[in-house]
Amino acid sequence: MADNQKERFPLIAIKDLTRWYPDSREPLFKKLNFELSKGEFTIVVGKSGIWKSTLVKFIIGQLRPYTRTVYYKMDDMAHFNDEDVQQYRRKIGIVFQDYKLISSLSVKENIVYPLRLENESDNSIQAKYRTITQKLHIEDINKLTCKTLSGWEKQKVAIARAMINDPEFIIADEPTWNLDRECTKEIGDLLIEANKMWNTIMLITHDMNLLDYIKSKTKVNIFKM
């Protein structure tokens, strides 16, 4: 399918996906249907549990789906080989629940780490770093090491790192799980700002305060599990 045709379809489409609990006859989810479209802010909400991490693993290609269940721009991901999966993952920015920062490195080096992996020039790295830190208003912490940061500061760094390489979409997996209400609002504001910068956002959360706050500030799609 030509790229211009694919633009009309969702970035991610899940169709009738069923997954079972290990060693159980109980389904984790049954005939799940989900879409993530370009430019949208989608919130996946539900109780904490294994289902959300399993859903993310399918979307990022860590778990291989059955044929005709998970699609990227209408390409059946069941047919992706290892190289296809690696190229696809480069198009995703991920904000992890536990940050996944390198504690010995500075804030800057953590944020630009994806660019280093792609062997970008120093000039390009500096320009992208300056742009993202200004837009997210985190210039004040850029010379610190990550081991000295608070939880919400670490999550701000993680969001900047997820955005630095201009991904097709960002997955934020429970980004406020250990934050108080005020810090939760700040993270919500950063995700809203990321969406305004034309980033497609998929937020996974069980935090109803975060859900209500983001809903009050911007248009969202809500997917309940």
PLM region spans:
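Helix-to-loop junction immediately C-terminal to a conserved catalytic motif
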Residues: I60
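Catalytic Walker B motif of ABC-type/P-loop ATPase nucleotide-binding domains
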Residues: I170-D173
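Hydrophobic anchor residue at the start of the ABC signature
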Residues: I159
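Conserved ABC ATPase "signature" region
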Residues: D76, N123-I141
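Conserved ABC transporter NBD signature motif
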Residues: R68-M77
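Conserved catalytic motifs of ABC-family nucleotide-binding domains
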Residues: D166
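Conserved ABC ATPase signature
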Residues: T145-E153
